[in-house]
A protein has these predicted regions:
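Pre-active-site segment of Zn-dependent metallo-hydrolases
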Residues: 1-33, 64-83, 90, 94-135, ...
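Short, polar loop motifs at secondary-structure junctions
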Residues: 91-93, 161-168, 253-256
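Active-site-proximal loop/helix segments of hydrolase catalytic cores
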Residues: 147, 198-265
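Active-site HxH/HxHxD metal-binding segment of metal-dependent hydrolases
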Residues: 121-181
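Active-site neighborhood of phospho(di)ester-bond hydrolases with catalytic His/Asp-centered motifs
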Residues: 105-109, 130-144, 160-164, 221-226, ...
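C-terminal regulatory/interaction regions
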Residues: 1-50, 285-313
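Beta-strand-turn-beta hairpins that frame and shape the catalytic cleft
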Residues: 80-86, 98-104, 183-196, 213-220, ...
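Binuclear metal-ion centers of metallo-dependent hydrolases, dominated by the metallo-beta-lactamase
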Residues: 1, 171-194, 201-204, 214, ...
Length: 313
């Protein structure tokens, strides 16, 4: 069949539909589990290969893939959690943590490539409807999205940020200290969260590490972009001051990964920040790199793509 002879770009464009489609299907049929099963590694490594080829940025095959992943996430968000803690990975370091009583959002953003949004505004609106509160770790555009924060505020839901994010906005709760903050936060639905805020950093930038415990006594830690050589000295023993996390959400390129993980001693570790598409390809962190690091880790770890979820039992 000579359909593509002499038309290499059209050929690769068609191939991209096939690749993204098959990756989507493989991830759907093989949902996240602890460890590194071959089929998931193959799917995620192939996703790396596609996402590190910038010719596919903002193309129809890429957009279809993202939309498909997000639609699956939205369908699953319609199913209440009866028991345990379910963690959803949205995009980049954006996560949703859900128990029977509460749905918590961390660092949810639309994301963008050259100014074009990745996750649609319509999808974000539906996510916000499901969530009770938004925590933002630090003042970078791939973690803090004004549109997302405004949707929470309009819905009368709390938005928690460090003091250097939108500092003049009185509708937002600004929380940051050099000491550990210990706070109870009341939600619109009448539920309460116990929250500890640790004074982390990404280099010199303040990076709040949130330790959030629900009424079911399920604890989630979101470390944001924690990366600081001095902080690790106190983080290595932080489990003495915090409840044991059911899920530790850790960025895949953090400083001294194993020391940070052992410092919290979590039941499950879930990585974030792979393939942040606003970056050049050298900092679109690869899933193959994440697996390389996590295979050294003694704790239960789970590596997820966009629009996936895992029930921590």
């Amino acid at each position: 069949n000579g359909e593509f002879w002499g038309k290499s770009e059209a050929y690769l464009h068609k191939q991209a539909f096939q690749m993204f489609g098959l990756i989507d299907e493989a991830l759907t049929q093989n949902p996240p589990v602890v460890g590194a099963p071959m089929v998931r590694k193959l799917a995620l490594f192939n996703l790396d290969a596609m996402l590190h080829e910038t010719k596919y940025d903002n193309t129809e095959p890429f957009n279809n893939f993202v939309d498909s992943r997000m639609q699956k996430l939205l369908v699953e968000l319609n199913n209440p959690v009866k028991k345990g803690l379910k963690i959803f990975k949205v995009y980049n370091d954006g996560f949703i943590a859900r128990t029977q009583s509460t749905t918590i959002a961390f660092d949810i953003v639309r994301g963008s490539i050259q100014g074009k949004e990745i996750v649609s505004e319509e999808c974000i609106k539906q996510i916000v409807e499901h969530c009770d509160i938004l925590f933002i770790t630090h003042n970078h555009g791939d973690h803090a999205d004004r549109l997302v924060a405004d949707l929470f505020i309009e819905a009368g839901k709390p938005v928690i940020v460090p003091t250097n994010i939108w500092p003049d906005d009185k509708a937002i709760q600004h929380l940051r200290s050099d000491e550990i903050i210990d706070k109870e936060i009341a939600l619109k639905n009448g539920k309460k969260l116990q929250v500890k805020i640790l004074p982390g950093h990404q280099s010199e930038l303040m990076n709040n590490i949130y330790v959030v415990t629900t009424e079911e006594k399920k604890t989630i830690v979101q470390t944001g972009d924690q990366y600081h050589k001095e902080d690790i000295n106190w983080l290595m023993n932080i489990h003495q001051k915090t409840p044991r996390p059911d899920a530790l959400l850790v960025n895949c390129w953090t400083n001294r990964m194993n020391d940070l993980i052992e410092g919290f001693a979590p039941k499950f570790v879930i990585t974030g920040h792979e393939n942040e598409m606003g970056h050049t390809i050298d900092h679109r962190e690869a899933f193959w790199l994440t697996f390389q690091k996590m295979e050294e880790i003694k704790r239960n770890y789970v590596v997820m793509g966009w629009g996936e979820w895992f029930l921590c039992k």
